[in-house]
Amino acid sequence: MIFKNKSKLILIIGGILVYLASAGISYGAFRFLGSGSSLLSPVDITPGSGFKIDPNAPKTEACPLTGQLFTKAEKQIWEKRRPLTVMIENHADSRPQSGLSKADVVYEAVAEGGITRFLAVFYCNASEEVTVGPVRSARTYFMDFASEYGDYPLYAHVGGANVPGPANALGQIGDYGWLDKGNDMNQFSIGFPTYWRDYERIGHAVATEHTMYSTTEKLWEVASKRGLNATDEEGNKWNAKFTEWKFKDDEKLEARGTTSKIDFSFWNNNPDYAVTWEYNKDQNQYLRVNGGQPLKDLNSDSQIQVKTVIIQFMKEKGPIDEVKHILYTTTGTGNALIFQDGKAIEGTWAKEKRQSRTKFTDGSGKEISLNRGPIWIEIVPSGQKANY
């Protein structure tokens, strides 16, 4: 091709050079952002900025959910979003799950047939992107627990119970205003790439129901696009009605107790779902054993460990319909056991209504201060025993 117009030729060549330069810059930028950076939200909450937390920075900022201390940079992250709750399954074939070690609070209860399920609450301890799953379906009583984290907590799940009557979780999501508000994070309405299936996640093929995955950052990104950050589009703060628990520091080593093991079952004769928490006195942590095996997080290959284990004994009803759904009486009062510092505290739980914070009190009626750090709450049917 021969160009007779030199000005035109110069413009074309200049355009090509600008394109190549910008492409090179973009390529370099994307390589930088993707080169091992498991970032989640940076301080300025710009996804993909490559921001990482300095592990040596002072930890001075208390998480409102657990009292655990984090850096100022991490606080800048969580202050710009709202808690994310995720339904994660615990079928024996789904283990090890992903993300549980990064949850601030985990609730565990039977979903059906003696098989338990988790509601994992992510907020302060997920400043870096956390892969979560397998994600499973909604249950009404887990929504009662999620409701403690604001009127419109982010609730991630894959479908849910959809039957006439009190177990109608999908119907209740609409009744609570979660569909209209947009805090319902149902995979059925969001889909790929926020959610995806991984059939080889644990090194071998598993049934389809054990394959749904997401990440905390992908879910928070969807929420942000819907105007649900720390405040909503009307300026309402997620924590305007949120009640914090009371927290305390660990007991000194010499003051710690000798309760070294906690054993219980949700249902009898169901060994795959029997739970043991083993106390490490030096670390002042409780390590989880499930079905006789250490329960690990697939992301890190580390055993699940928490600072406080709470057993809430709760009235179980059901099966209440032909598809064997069960319910728990999540409001009112009941007995509780609180394990921390190697000690067992016999107490009481109380919750006034769905959106109320569950409170834990000792025998004198005083609210129990919980150790700073991850908390695991076990919803065990009334009448079951815990050995310790």
Roles of regions detected by a PLM:
Residues 12-27:
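Hydrophobic membrane-insertion alpha-helices, especially the h-region
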